């Protein structure tokens, strides 16, 4: 039984973000549809060949997407919201873009479909919409066309399909309420049709992704798998594919299915390989997800070999990435600025393919010398001074319960803060960033490229901060911000100023659609060599008598939006960041900054996939925030900001943060999110966002007043703040001025109405 290699998917965007550039050029009307389609074909052909050359035996086909693979599945099933349908019922690539973006070069604009996080990753998918009595049909044949492409190129392939149960689980009901699981019988004929077409093409194996099987699913959903897979059995061999967690809790459901193989994530799950081997049907293939598809670290292949070698010869075995390599940058070899030592610790998508090939060869031959050679830098890293900082480790070990406690409870602090700031009722503020104009971005780029010296750069940034203060004073805001002109990204900026992080040149990963991010990498113990934000905050405060907020990104968000170390726990990393930023809070306070905002938009999205694991995560996540903030004196007001999310199931933890003020996104939910705070009897102050910054629309005074009155029905008015939903970085100045002017006017009207 020869062991083969495969990946669950490969990055789509291209090494130089070619797909992003082609998409945005097409959307802007600067290139043709044919040019866009040609870029897609070129990228697919290149990526298949690269994986093949790196040693992958079975190439994934169907992992490419023009926007998102869940959206591609929606089109495959003919699931197009009525507002996005073509008059003649046809579908084209613009149909797909209208669903994802709300507009495309052809067709009428309409509200984009909702977007949310793909399980617990930083990738976003387009949420399928379901309605009662909906019909499904195979119309969008992208998968079949790409299979034909790959076969014509002579590749040995494994088509990839998102499974029917997970697809329904990921969607939402629109209109009249009903159980979306009842649609399963209606989508299965489309899956049967697709599998029949693949069988006609001589396909042996199909990877069918059911990551919902790692969740704590309701029994009705678990029960749905057997009839679904009974309907799909018999045409091709099915590799039931799971990832992001282990399958052991749902293994009884899995082993009853008529499939021929199972893929398990042996990185993020706690499944025992020996137990899996014992419980799986003897004729099933086991695909072992041994190489981490979600991180950038070189694997210890000697360890992976030991983990799986006992199964060699006992059952059919493949070695694979834990999940799609979509979540990893493409190619380490093009990184020229990483020093040799650090570079030797990393492996990007192509290098991970090479790791799989090395592991396959060793398992097939029993020769492990190549594995030991590959793994040598990992042994060196374990003892590197770049990784370990004794002072940080000592400080972390010395944390006590007192370090996460403010001096006095909120009621006492609130009195001290009222006496210090003397703010009016309905105080107005913004979330932090102001428009990142072409001038600001150009200034940073020129400085980064060496075209501008430090003095001229600082002079330019100071001028933009000054203008931001002038604008806010002119508008009549009560609590100001410096505008963050010096920051490119809320995580990258802090990573650049903390020891323990490194940055890549081309380490791009897809976030959604054409948006790519370049996460920092945590390589070692984290510390703060010098103050980060103090100078600009102090300068901004010197320009006004009104309070200016200090602006920090919180420890959990920095952790969640970075590539973390694998040799320590996430809790350890978060608390190291918290200690570093605790010193920043103390320095801001010493510099006269009386209000400090610590943003934690990622607190909820970092939750483990299984509800039973939430408490442990929330305990250390909340503690990290409190360690960060608790150094502040009573009269220093601590704010936090959280992006749009459900709060009702984590309200205990939100309250436990003990922030003096929390600002949240609520305008899109018509203040419904405040129900959670009302029901919980949330004790501290709240700033419910009164307008959606993701839209260029300017809200009217009357509309904002109505929202605030609705908020005051749930939260006492004396504890309410007035602010936008989120930062204003992506907006232009004209709509920003107009919207903030109306927001301030609405607050003034409510004060006068008292």
Swiss-Prot record:
Keywords, comma-separated and alphabetical: Amino-acid biosynthesis, Metal-binding, Methionine biosynthesis, Methyltransferase, Repeat, Transferase, Zinc
Reaction it catalyzes: 5-methyltetrahydropteroyltri-L-glutamate + L-homocysteine = tetrahydropteroyltri-L-glutamate + L-methionine
GO molecular function, one term: zinc ion binding
Essential cofactor(s): Zn(2+)
UniProt EC number: 2.1.1.14
UniProt key word Membrane: no
Any Pfam family matching the protein: Meth_synt_2
Binding site for L-homocysteine: 431-433, 484, 599
CDD domains named among the record's database cross-references: CIMS_C_terminal_like, CIMS_N_terminal_like
Details of cofactor binding: Binds 1 zinc ion per subunit.
UniProt-listed InterPro entries: Cbl-indep_Met_Synth_N, Cobalamin-indep_Met_synthase, Met_Synth_C/arc, UROD/MetE-like_sf
Pathway: Amino-acid biosynthesis; L-methionine biosynthesis via de novo pathway; L-methionine from L-homocysteine (MetE route): step 1/1
EC top class, as a word: transferase
Gene Ontology process terms (BP): methionine biosynthetic process; methylation
Annotated Zn(2+) binding sites: 641, 643, 665, 726
Active site: 694 (proton donor)
Positions that bind 5-methyltetrahydropteroyltri-L-glutamate: 17-20, 117, 515-516, 561, 605
Residues noted as binding L-methionine in the record, renumbered to the chain: 431-433, 484, 599
Function: Catalyzes the transfer of a methyl group from 5-methyltetrahydrofolate to homocysteine resulting in methionine formation.
Stated family: Belongs to the vitamin-B12 independent methionine synthase family.
Name of this protein: 5-methyltetrahydropteroyltriglutamate--homocysteine methyltransferase
Species assigned in the record: Salmonella choleraesuis (strain SC-B67)
Primary gene name: metE
């Amino acid at each position: 039984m020869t062991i083969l290699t495969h990946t669950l998917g490969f990055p789509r965007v291209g090494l130089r973000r070619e797909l992003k550039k082609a998409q945005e050029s097409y959307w802007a009307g600067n290139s043709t549809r044919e040019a866009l389609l040609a870029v897609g074909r070129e990228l697919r052909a290149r990526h298949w060949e690269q994986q093949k050359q790196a040693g992958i035996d079975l190439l994934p086909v169907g992992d490419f997407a023009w926007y998102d693979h869940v959206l591609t599945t929606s089109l495959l099933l003919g699931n197009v919201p009525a507002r996005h349908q073509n008059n003649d019922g046809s579908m084209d690539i613009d149909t797909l873009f209208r669903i994802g973006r709300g507009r495309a070069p052809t067709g009428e604009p309409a509200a984009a479909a909702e977007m949310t996080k793909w399980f617990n990753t930083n990738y976003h998918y387009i949420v399928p919409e379901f309605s009662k009595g909906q019909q499904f049909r195979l119309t969008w044949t992208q998968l079949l066309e790409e299979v034909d492409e790959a076969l014509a190129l002579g590749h040995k392939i494994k088509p990839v399909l998102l499974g029917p149960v997970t697809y329904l689980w990921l969607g939402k009901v629109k209109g009249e309420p009903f159980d979306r699981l009842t649609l399963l019988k209606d989508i299965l004929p489309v899956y049967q049709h697709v599998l029949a077409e693949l069988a006609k093409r001589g396909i042996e194996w199909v990877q069918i992704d059911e990551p919902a099987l790692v969740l704590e699913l309701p029994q009705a959903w678990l029960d749905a798998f057997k009839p679904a897979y009974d309907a799909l059995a018999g045409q091709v061999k099915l590799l039931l594919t799971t990832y992001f967690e282990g399958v052991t809790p749902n293994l009884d459901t899995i082993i009853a299915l008529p499939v021929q193989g199972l893929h398990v994530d042996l990185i993020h799950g706690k499944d025992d390989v020996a137990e899996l081997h014992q419980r799986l049907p003897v004729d099933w293939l086991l695909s072992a997800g041994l190489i981490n598809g979600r991180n950038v670290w070189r694997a210890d292949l000697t360890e992976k070999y030991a983990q799986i070698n006992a199964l060699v010869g006992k059952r059919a075995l493949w070695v694979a990435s834990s999940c799609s390599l979509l979540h990893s940058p493409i190619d380490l070899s093009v990184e020229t600025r990483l020093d040799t030592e650090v570079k030797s610790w990393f492996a990007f998508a192509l290098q991970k393919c090479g790791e799989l090939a090395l592991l396959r060869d060793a398992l097939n031959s029993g020769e492990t010398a190549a594995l030991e050679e590959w793994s040598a830098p990992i042994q060196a890293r374990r003892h590197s001074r770049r990784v370990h900082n004794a002072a940080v480790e000592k400080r972390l070990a010395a944390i006590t319960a007192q370090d996460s406690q403010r001096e006095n409870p909120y009621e006492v602090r609130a009195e001290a803060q009222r006496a210090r700031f003397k703010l009016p009722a309905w105080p107005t503020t913004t979330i932090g960033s102001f428009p990142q104009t072409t001038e600001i971005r150009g200034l940073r780029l020129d400085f980064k490229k060496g075209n501008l010296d430090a003095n001229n750069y600082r002079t330019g940034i100071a001028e933009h901060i000054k203008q931001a203060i002038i604008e806010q004073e002119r508008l009549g805001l009560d609590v100001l911000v410096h505008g963050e002109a010096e920051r490119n990204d809320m995580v990258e900026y802090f990573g650049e100023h903390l020891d323990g992080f490194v940055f890549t040149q081309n380490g791009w990963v897809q976030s959604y659609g054409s948006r790519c991010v370049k996460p920092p990498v945590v390589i070692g113990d984290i510390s703060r060599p010098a103050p980060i934000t103090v100078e600009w905050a102090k300068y901004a405060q010197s320009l006004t008598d009104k309070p200016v907020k200090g602006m920090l990104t919180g420890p959990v968000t920095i952790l969640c939006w970075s590539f973390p170390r694998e040799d320590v726990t996430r809790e350890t990393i978060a608390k190291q960041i918290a200690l570093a930023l605790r010193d920043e809070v103390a320095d801001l306070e010493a510099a006269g900054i009386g209000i400090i905002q610590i943003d934690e938009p990622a607190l909820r999205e970092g939750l483990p996939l299984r509800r039973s694991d939430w408490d442990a995560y929330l305990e250390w996540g909340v503690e990290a925030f409190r360690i960060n903030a608790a150094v502040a004196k009573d009269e220093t007001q601590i704010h936090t900001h959280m992006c749009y999310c459900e709060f009702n199931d984590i309200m205990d933890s939100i309250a436990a943060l003990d922030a003096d003020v929390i600002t949240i996104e609520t305008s899109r939910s018509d203040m419904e999110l405040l129900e959670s705070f009302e029901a919980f009897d949330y004790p501290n102050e709240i700033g419910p966002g009164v307008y959606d910054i993701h839209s260029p629309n300017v809200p009217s005074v009357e509309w904002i007043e109505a929202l605030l009155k609705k908020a005051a029905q749930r939260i006492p008015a004396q504890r309410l703040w007035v602010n936008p939903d989120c930062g204003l970085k992506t907006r232009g100045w004209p709509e920003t001025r107009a919207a903030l002017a109306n927001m301030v006017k609405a607050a003034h009207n409510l004060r006068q109405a008292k």
